[in-house]
Amino acid sequence: MRRFLLSLFALATVAVPVARAQAPEALWYATNDERSVQSFLAHADRVSVIAPQSFSMDSIGIIWGQVDSRMVAAARAKHVKLIPLIVNPGFDQSIFHRVLVTPDSRARAVHNITALCRDNHFDGIQFDFENVRVTDRDAFTSFSREVADSLHRVGCSLSAAVVPRASDYPGPTAYHKWIYDNWRGAYDYKALADAMDFISLMTYSQHTRRTPPGPVAGYPWMEEVVKYVLALGVPPAKLSLGIPSYSEWWYPTYDAAEGPRMTGGGLNFDAAQGILARNGAKATWDDKQKEGMAFWQDDGINEFLFLVDARSFAARVALAKQYGLRGYSVWVIGQEDPAVWR
């Protein structure tokens, strides 16, 4: 009860919209996909940080991968910070768990992460460790402190992309508990923000195959998550709001194990426009969710498309500004509505 009362007090005193004088930091994630590379080359002067998802780490702390050389050159020429991501390959839970609990692997990982940043003259590293057990929460936090201390000694920053949640209550169903125990619950937002330079909330892909179709990142849900994280004591200057650049198309599928169900798939803006045109559909603006939405029937079965365009992007940038956040982190460059750059 005391914890609950303290949380209410924090909500009342911390999660208040404020103005941030400087322009928000524009972090864009990237892949080595040609579309992603070309969009960065064309718009590097509008990007504060480029964060390519380029490196993987195995269970003994060995790191491999590389950033596209064209991205490196453009980042240097345009004075864009280069902060690549390190992932657990395939978001394999056991890989990162073994790093955390095996002393030799853990020490090797700290050393290799530091060497990667220092030797390549990166500005920092961002963790993208997902599908992490809630029981590894404290180990993840302490590992992050070790890496942050080591990186800071060589002039590099550390941040983390974190799976969002709006409470520490797992939810009413077995699925809610599973997703909390394996995806959402492992991130101690306040402790990670204290140890690191900032955290990027992955406030997108709000709906999953276990939920009804819905927005890619509904505005009320995003704001709820932001308020919750700020109420925990995370400084706004250490919080970057995740923004999707992609749209989602929901269509019926069937598999033997689960039977018929709806599946959501991510689309770049051009592909989303193509699907709308092919089905004679037009997205209608939802002012509550601040996304476009269209639906149509194929053989009598509803299909849905949730459209992220320049208007929805601008609304989410405004949300980051409203709460005085550090900035925003966009997944992913190359999938966006071209109008976001105008």
Question: What are the language-model segments listed below?
Answer:
Residues 312-342:
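Acidic/aromatic/glycine-rich contiguous surface patches that form carbohydrate-binding/processing clefts
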Residues 31-44, 103-118, 181-190, 309-319:
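Short, acidic/polar
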Residues 50, 127, 199, 241, ...:
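Conserved, mostly hydrophobic/aromatic
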Residues 90-120, 168-187, 204:
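Active-site-adjacent "subsite" loops/lids of carbohydrate-active enzymes
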Residues 4-15:
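Sec-dependent N-terminal signal peptides
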Residues 60-62, 66, 133-276:
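Substrate-binding surface in catalytic domains of secreted glycosidases
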